[in-house]
Each structure stands twice: as structure tokens, then as C-alpha cells.
């Protein structure tokens, strides 16, 4: 994901403070790599072009997880390579984590009855991070264990995001980003 918000921007710093305060306290995850990743994810997902980054063949943003999964298939979908599949799966994991952690109620408001429910979204997020972790050669070797951790700790990370949302609500942040 190409950062749209500069590293030194106050919004990024704000999310880093909130996430690094909530995660160790409520989840027991005192892992700066995880909290940095989550805070950066929140920052970048404030831009809808990052939240709905996967596109169909005509360039239309895909908003449903099922459509994203189909697109990520390098044989049957629109992913032109296994590298593109990895990047799409990373995004699917990020999207699932964000959706289930920050906006679990959005799972009940889905317009398409064929789209994933809450538990399916959790399973898809974990599976997507696991698939990303299996790209463990060459340029991906160093970050593969991190995505394995995200897969294993998905529910704790999701719970941490619910606590982040509670903290944002307490501070008077806007209610809906999705």
C-alpha cells in the first residue's frame, strides 16, 4: 500500500498513540511491529481509495470480500501474477481485520446476502494473512513471519481494534468511516 498520509502527519501520530495505548492494555499484545502496522492501517484506510483498493477488470472498486477473493485468484481472477495475489490477499486480510474490529455491525448491514458474514470474514482474514505468510522467499522472507503472527493473533488484533474504536468514540471521533 502506498502511504497517502505522510509519516509525520498528526493523524498518523494520533493513531499510533491510541493503538499503542490500547493493544498492550486490552489484548496483552505488547508488540511494536503489530501496533505500528495496525496504526498505519487505520491511517491509510481513512482514504477510501486505500480501503477499496482492489478493482475489477473495468477498474471499478470492489467493496465485497467475496469479489475481492475472486479477483485475487491468479488463475481465475484478475491477479496477473502470484505477487499480485499476495498483495491482494494482504489487502483482504487488512480489510477483514478493519471491518470486523472497527465496524463489526457492518457485517449485519451487508446489501448482498451472498457476501461474508462476521465469522466468514474472520476466517477469510486469518486465511489471507496465512497465505501471505507462505510467500516466504526472496523479498518476502523477512516479513513472512509477521503475517503468520497476524493470522494466529487475528482475533486479538480484532479485539484490540474494538478497544481502539471505543477510545475514538470516547474522544469524540466521527462514527462511520465505511
Task: Enumerate the predicted regions with their spans.
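Polar/charged low-complexity regulatory segments
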Residues: 1-177
Amino acid at each position: 500500500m502506498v502511504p497517502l498520509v505522510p509519516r509525520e502527519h498528526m493523524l498518523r501520530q494520533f493513531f499510533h498513540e491510541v493503538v499503542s495505548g490500547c493493544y498492550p492494555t486490552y489484548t496483552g499484545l505488547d508488540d511494536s511491529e503489530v501496533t505500528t502496522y495496525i496504526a498505519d492501517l487505520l491511517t491509510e484506510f481513512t482514504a477510501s481509495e486505500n480501503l477499496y483498493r482492489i478493482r475489477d477488470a473495468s477498474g471499478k472498486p470492489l467493496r465485497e470480500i467475496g469479489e475481492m477473493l475472486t479477483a485475487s485468484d491468479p488463475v481465475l481472477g484478475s491477479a496477473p501474477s502470484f505477487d499480485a495475489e499476495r498483495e491482494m490477499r494482504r489487502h483482504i486480510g487488512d480489510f477483514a481485520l478493519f471491518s470486523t474490529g472497527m465496524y463489526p455491525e457492518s457485517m449485519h448491514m451487508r446489501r448482498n446476502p451472498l457476501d461474508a458474514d462476521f465469522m466468514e470474514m474472520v476466517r477469510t482474514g486469518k486465511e489471507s494473512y496465512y497465505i501471505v505468510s507462505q510467500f516466504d522467499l526472496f523479498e518476502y522472507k523477512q516479513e513472512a513471519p509477521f503475517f503468520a503472527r497476524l493470522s494466529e493473533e487475528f482475533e486479538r488484533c480484532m479485539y484490540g481494534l474494538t478497544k481502539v474504536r471505543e477510545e475514538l468514540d470516547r474522544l469524540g471521533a466521527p462514527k462511520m468511516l465505511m
